[in-house]
């Protein structure tokens, strides 16, 4: 996994981790229509901004629709997943650093 390089994350989903700071990092994620990010959780706090498209997030059992220009906060340890309702692109911001993605 390389910094500033696109990689396949899941079927229909690719991501690029941008160069991280000391305590915060960004990751761009592109979804084909119908592609899903499987449910997971992590101790990191996350902000997700929709650059384009429309997605349905499940965050701790609640559905949140996210469209271009909108953002959502995903608290630490919240179980979350997402499905793209159309081709979509997100910018995820994490703090502290996601060492699991960087190593």
Label each PLM-derived region with a short phrase.
Residues 1-23, 103:
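A short, N-terminal "cap"/entry segment at the start of jelly-roll beta-barrel domains
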Residues 27-41:
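Conserved short histidine dyad/triad with adjacent acidic residue
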Residues 36-37, 56, 72, 76-81:
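Histidine-centered metal-chelating micro-motifs
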Residues 44-45, 49-55, 60:
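Glycine- and acidic-residue-biased ligand/ion/polar-headgroup-sensing regions
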Residues 51-52, 67-68, 86:
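A cytosolic small-molecule/anion-sensing beta-strand core signal
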Residues 54-56, 63, 79, 89:
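Structural motif
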Residues 61-76:
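Short acidic-glycine-tyrosine-enriched beta hairpin
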Residues 76-100:
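Ligand-binding loop in jelly-roll beta-barrel domains
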């Amino acid at each position: 996994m390389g910094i500033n390089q696109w990689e396949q994350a899941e079927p229909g989903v690719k991501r690029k981790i941008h160069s991280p700071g000391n305590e915060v990092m960004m990751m761009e994620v592109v979804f084909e229509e119908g592609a899903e990010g499987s449910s997971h959780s992590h101790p990191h706090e996350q902000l997700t901004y929709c650059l384009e498209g429309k997605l349905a997030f499940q965050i701790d059992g609640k559905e949140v629709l996210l469209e271009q220009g909108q953002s959502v906060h995903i608290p630490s340890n919240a179980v979350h997943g997402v499905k793209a309702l159309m081709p979509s692109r997100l910018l995820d911001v994490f703090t502290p650093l996601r060492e699991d993605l960087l190593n």
